[in-house]
């Protein structure tokens, strides 16, 4: 009897262990990455061209550039320079001459080899002031002035390496199979990509889709990744959407069409800056999902953002307005398709009126002031400040390194001119379907699709 009871316990334990093992195997099988499937992305952004060097720059252009093309180096999440098409580099002449050694065995999507001649041609076109020399597997770049952190600049999307001809060819993990400017792009995964084939078979991108249409197709299961407007992120989270967001990495700024022509005009701009309640904008319009900004670069990048006050000072704004005397009405322009820009512009008008300033919105391209949004890059302080100046049509700063003190001084000097008034740093937010696994974005909103795979469908 005792023996039968012991056997019964042994059998029960064996069954329990077998059940646990089977469950573990099933779970492992269910979560193990698998190849196949097409990732469907919908966005409100549009592109007329996939050429990385075309203006205007945008987060969408940068993300597509990373899928189709490569740069000589990349910047990781910690701001460190990592090899990409180049596996080593060195400098001489105190940072005025740089030499890069190309990796071997890299091919374009048509199977042709990457050569130093092709690399040099791409860099010359993107940077006419550089002297670029190719020899063997070496690419040498001679600059007009020394730049100690020059490789960071080569990580920018506009310096992606491509071969131009009847079509643009790249060395990235995907190749373009269909392209309808401003509407649709279809990419296919490359089996011969140097870092190994991605799990996805392809990516389908639908452009120019309003937020409401994106939400509908997402809820119907027809889209995997959609935009979420910064001011809608809290609501989307409350509705149970799965969200992925970046650090505050898009600058919303007031940009004046010209420099202040007199001290009176500078005082009026100072009064406008003092009147705007940025913290209230962030709290009410963004529900604290962004950051009030008085600096061009975000604090997470520089560490010095707190040195610029974003608080409103209506008393000081009124005083400056009185000192300035008679003033004309400013015309404020913005992108009419940008719902957030519209409500921010309305808030600016109210704040300005409280300070005695006259501002009216306009859809004209010749506005006195424009409310614009500029995506930031994950490079370094010096490079990013130079890129911001370029995006705003302002002569780039001449800094040889990303020393924080020198970057702060350059930014502070520029902000004192009141050519621009920073308002907010925004996050890039995406809605992700349950079938998308391992989706992640960088601090600047860049997609990382190398490990992305799809569950539940092909």
State the predicted function of each range.
Residues 2, 363-402:
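Acidic-aromatic pocket-rim loops
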Residues 87-130, 140, 262-264:
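Aromatic- and charge-enriched surface segment that lines or borders ligand/interaction sites
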Residues 116-117, 121, 138-140, 201-202, ...:
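Alpha-helical secondary-structure segments
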Residues 287-324, 336-342:
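Structural transition elements
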């Amino acid at each position: 009897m005792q023996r039968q009871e012991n056997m019964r316990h042994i059998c029960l334990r064996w069954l329990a262990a077998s059940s646990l093992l089977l469950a573990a195997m099933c779970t492992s099988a269910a979560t193990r990455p698998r190849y196949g499937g097409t990732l469907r992305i919908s966005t409100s952004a549009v592109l007329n061209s996939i050429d990385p060097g075309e203006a205007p720059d945008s987060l969408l252009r940068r993300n597509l550039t990373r899928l189709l093309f490569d740069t000589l180096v990349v910047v990781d999440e910690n701001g460190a320079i990592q090899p990409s098409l180049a596996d080593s580099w060195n400098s001489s002449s105190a940072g005025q001459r740089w030499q890069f050694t190309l990796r071997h065995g890299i091919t374009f999507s048509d199977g042709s080899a990457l050569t130093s001649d092709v690399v040099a041609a791409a860099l010359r076109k993107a940077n006419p002031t550089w002297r670029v020399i190719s020899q063997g597997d070496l690419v040498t770049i001679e600059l007009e002035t020394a730049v100690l952190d020059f490789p960071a600049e080569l990580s920018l999307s506009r310096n992606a390496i491509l071969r131009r001809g009847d079509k643009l060819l790249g060395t990235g993990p995907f190749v373009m199979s269909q392209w309808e400017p401003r509407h649709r792009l279809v990419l296919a995964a490359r089996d011969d990509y140097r870092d190994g084939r991605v799990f996805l078979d392809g990516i389908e991108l639908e452009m120019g889709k309003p937020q409401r249409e994106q939400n509908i197709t997402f809820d119907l299961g027809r889209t995997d990744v959609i935009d979420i407007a910064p001011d809608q992120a809290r609501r989307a989270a409350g509705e149970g959407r799965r969200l992925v967001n970046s650090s505050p990495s898009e600058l919303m700024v007031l940009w004046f069409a010209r420099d202040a022509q007199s001290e009176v005009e500078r005082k009026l701009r100072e009064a406008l800056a003092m009147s705007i309640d940025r913290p209230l904008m962030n709290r009410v319009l963004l529900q604290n999902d962004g950051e009030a900004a008085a600096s061009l670069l975000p604090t997470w990048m520089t560490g010095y953002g707190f040195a610029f006050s974003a608080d409103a000072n209506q008393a000081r704004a009124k005083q400056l307005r009185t000192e300035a005397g008679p003033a004309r009405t400013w015309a404020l322009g913005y992108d009419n398709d940008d719902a957030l820009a519209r409500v921010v512009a309305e808030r600016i008008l109210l704040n300005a009126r409280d300070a005695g300033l006259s501002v009216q919105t306009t859809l004209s391209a010749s506005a006195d002031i424009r409310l614009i949004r500029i995506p930031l890059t994950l490079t370094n302080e010096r490079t990013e400040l130079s890129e911001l100046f370029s995006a705003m049509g302002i002569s780039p700063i001449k800094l040889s390194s990303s020393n924080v003190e020198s970057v702060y001084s350059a930014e502070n000097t520029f902000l004192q001119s009141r050519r621009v008034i920073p308002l907010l740093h925004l996050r890039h937010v995406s809605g992700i379907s349950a079938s998308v696994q391992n989706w992640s974005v960088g601090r600047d909103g860049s997609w990382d699709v190398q490990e992305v795979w799809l569950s539940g469908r092909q």
